[in-house]
Swiss-Prot record:
The gene is DYDC1. One of its GO terms (cellular component) is radial spoke. Brain and testis. Accumulates during late stage of spermiogenesis. Keywords: Cell projection, Cilium, Cytoplasm, Cytoskeleton, Flagellum. Belongs to the dpy-30 family. InterPro entries: Dpy-30_motif (IPR007858), DYDC-like_DD (IPR049630), Sdc1/DPY30 (IPR037856). It comes from Homo sapiens. It is found in: Cytoplasm, Cytoskeleton, Flagellum axoneme. Component of the axonemal radial spoke complex 1 (RS1), at least composed of spoke head proteins RSPH1, RSPH3, RSPH9 and the cilia-specific component RSPH4A or sperm-specific component RSPH6A, spoke stalk proteins RSPH14, DNAJB13, DYDC1, ROPN1L and NME5, and the anchor protein IQUB. Interacts with SH3GL3. Its main location: cytoplasm. This is DPY30 domain-containing protein 1.
Amino acid sequence: MESIYLQKHLGACLTQGLAEVARVRPVDPIEYLALWIYKYKENVTMEQLRQKEMAKLERERELALMEQEMMERLKAEELLLQQQQLALQLELEMQEKERQRIQELQRAQEQLGKEMRMNMENLVRNEDILHSEEATLDSGKTLAEISDRYGAPNLSRVEELDEPMFSDIALNIDQDL
């Protein structure tokens, strides 16, 4: 059982150590073999530490890569979000401009409607005034103007001018002074 244990745990170490003793041929081979085994153990321990350190560095590198990928994804998402917000803001601005344009059009239509109503009212008034003037002109015509008979006298009409009254003249003099 001891030989199996020695072969399993110390077989490679003892084989290499004895080969080294045979190659170097020291004065005290037992002491040399003992020192060589200590050095071998130290080398194995250092190799294990180096392997652990390499594994740790590899894990840290993988974590750094994952973190970098995550940061890139976050930046991409943030950029996408900013673009969406900008698009939304532009859409809202366009809607606001469209709403203002519609309000301006409605105001213009209302103003145009008011102007058209006023024009229609003025037109109706003007027509009423024209009809009343025509009626007054017709009533103010002389019999000769109304009748188209041959031989009716054709006299021109003379309009009377308002003569200034004495009080109007006095007011004009006061204003001149």
